[in-house]
Curated annotation (Swiss-Prot):
Residues annotated as the enzyme's active site: 253 (proton acceptor)
Native organism: Arabidopsis thaliana (Mouse-ear cress)
Residues where Phosphothreonine is found: 286
Family annotation (PANTHER family): OS05G0577700 PROTEIN, SERINE/THREONINE-PROTEIN KINASE TNNI3K-RELATED
Domain Protein kinase: 108-385
Disulfide bond as UniProt keyword: no
UniProt GO cellular component terms: cytoplasm; cytosol
Record's protein name: Serine/threonine-protein kinase 54
Binding positions for ATP per the UniProt entry: 114-122, 135
Amino acid sequence: MKEKAESGGGVGYVRADQIDLKSLDEQLQRHLSKAWTMEKRKSLSDGEDNVNNTRHNQNNFGHRQLVFQRPLLGGGYSNNNNSSKNDIIRSTEVEKSRREWEIDPSKLIIKSVIARGTFGTVHRGIYDGQDVAVKLLDWGEEGHRSDAEIASLRAAFTQEVAVWHKLDHPNVTKFIGAAMGTSEMSIQTENGQMGMPSNVCCVVVEYCPGGALKSFLIKTRRRKLAFKVVIQLSLDLARGLSYLHSQKIVHRDVKTENMLLDKSRTLKIADFGVARLEASNPNDMTGETGTLGYMAPEVLNGSPYNRKCDVYSFGICLWEIYCCDMPYPDLSFSEVTSAVVRQNLRPEIPRCCPSSLANVMKRCWDANPEKRPEMEEVVAMLEAIDTSKGGGMIPPDQQQGCFCFRRHRGP
């Protein structure tokens, strides 16, 4: 799951060993209880009108017999007294689509916090007896955000769910289900059961105990990875991206923070918060979406882009997996942006890197998107690399005869 992560841009990594899990869980319980109470009071004040609406709706919608109106996907509320025939059909379709991915909250138990982000927290949990990760999105207490802001956040949430719930691949984190917050919904914690207010939603996915790939690379920064492991991780990522592209999905935020490792160290792509279906017209896909350092020149430049922006980001990740280091450590975000677009800045490839792997990096981060390979071809190139003779990055204390790093080219 993606969490705000990097330094220099107002975001940072969350170290789980420095989190007071008990305190955070208590804070979450107090916040949810407070928000639920506020929601209930507001609903009761409008109860008479809503009850009348519900009685009217019971004649037409047997599956929506709720005392309080339930928010539709995308943030709006149904107004059945004034709905046109098309609105009724669309509402029914939304309810049907919801059932495809909506979880049963009574089967979900939320446990300790493992990460925190701008709009919520990631918890360990149990769903129907299975270990899971639960992403709780909290859009703020009543009155703290405008209706338009909340609608936008809900739309982003439903976009992530719409993309994720249809995917099935060993290198993509398995989506289990999600829930939109409603007044009649409740969730369980280790300390009991409480209401889930309408400003809180959750996404439930498989739990990957190996954590983020970024953290794994940081831990192995000094000793580096065996070349065979480098290729295995890179192939996992390449196969996952190739699958996404075959489904017409552009991830748009490919980086090592968004890759998770399971107990067998299989890499799985996570966080589809900014993913979207690829537009048939490339001019429909514009805007700076992603993370600086991994973003392709055309994205940084505000030009139209397509799935090849993921290929560029993969090239940066490939370098990072091989080197177990950060690209552009001495440059600011603004310097990176300018140099990548105007000076063709790329990470310095170590001399000890086998030419077969270096060639993959260079092709993937070519400035011209049309010259970058498809991810299917990248998979084939990586599969063809011989790992039997080694070729991994040489640790710093063994680099006597191998000049592996030079200063980064920069502005």
